[in-house]
Amino acid sequence: MQIRYAGHSCFIIEGSKKLLFDPMPLEDPAAVEADLTLISHAHADHIGDAFARFSLTIAVHELSGYLKSLGVKTIGMNIGGSVEWEGITVRMVPATHSSSIRQKDGTSLYMGQACGFVVEMDGHVIYYAGDTGLFSDMKLIRELYHPDIAILPAGGRYTMGPEECMMAAAWIGAKTVIPMHVNTYPEIEQDMPAFKRAIELTTVMHVEIMQPDDVLELP
C-alpha cells in the first residue's frame, strides 16, 4: 500500500482500492482518479474537485445530500457510523471544525458537522483527522481503533498547530504521523523539521514530512 500526498490536505491512498481524501482544487481533476472519495467537510480547500469526479463519495449526511443533488454518487454517514465497502471499513469520527459552502452572494450554506475518518484497508488502520482542533476524545480513537498511521493538521489558525498536534499524536499513539494543512499559505507556516525532532526525540513515533507528489510506501 502507498500514500501519495497531493498537497494541503489531499492524499491518495492506494492498495487493493484507491482512496482520495479531501480533493482540493487541482489543475486537472481527471488526473487523480479514485475508487472512493472521502470528504471531511465542505470548505473549498477540501471539497475542491468533488463536483468534477465520478467516483463514489463518502461525506456527512447533509453534504452527501448536497453533492447528490449535483449528480455525485454518494454514501451519506454521520459521526459514529461505519460503512463496509469492497473489503474496506470506513468509520466517521468527530472533528472540531466548521463546515459550509460559500454562496455567490457571500452567505454560507451549512453542510453538517465536520468529521474525520478511520479507514481499515490491507492490514493498516489510518486515521485521517480532517480539519480539527485538539479534543480529548482523540484518546478514544486510540482505544477503539488502534491506528498505525495518523494524518493530522498542524498549521494553526484554522486548525490545531504544532504543539496541539504533538499532544494529539501522543493521545492517538500511531507509529507514523503525517502532518497536513501546513505551509500551504503564509498564515499556516510552521517549522516542521522542529516538529519532527520534538516528537522523534521524545517518543517512538516516526514523523513523515511529505511534500506534494511524495509517496510513502507501506509494507
Curated annotation (Swiss-Prot):
Keyword Calcium: no
SUPFAM superfamilies named among the record's database cross-references: Metallo-hydrolase/oxidoreductase
GO molecular function (one): hydrolase activity
Assigned keywords, A-Z: Hydrolase
Pfam name, any one: Lactamase_B_3
Domain of life (superkingdom): Archaea
Keyword DNA-binding: no
Family: Belongs to the UPF0173 family.
Record HAMAP family: UPF0173
PANTHER family: UPF0173 METAL-DEPENDENT HYDROLASE MJ1163, UPF0173 METAL-DEPENDENT HYDROLASE MJ1163-RELATED
Listed name of the protein: UPF0173 metal-dependent hydrolase Mlab_1154
Organism field: Methanocorpusculum labreanum (strain ATCC 43576 / DSM 4855 / Z)
Phylogenetic classification of the source organism: Archaea, Methanobacteriati, Methanobacteriota, Stenosarchaea group, Methanomicrobia
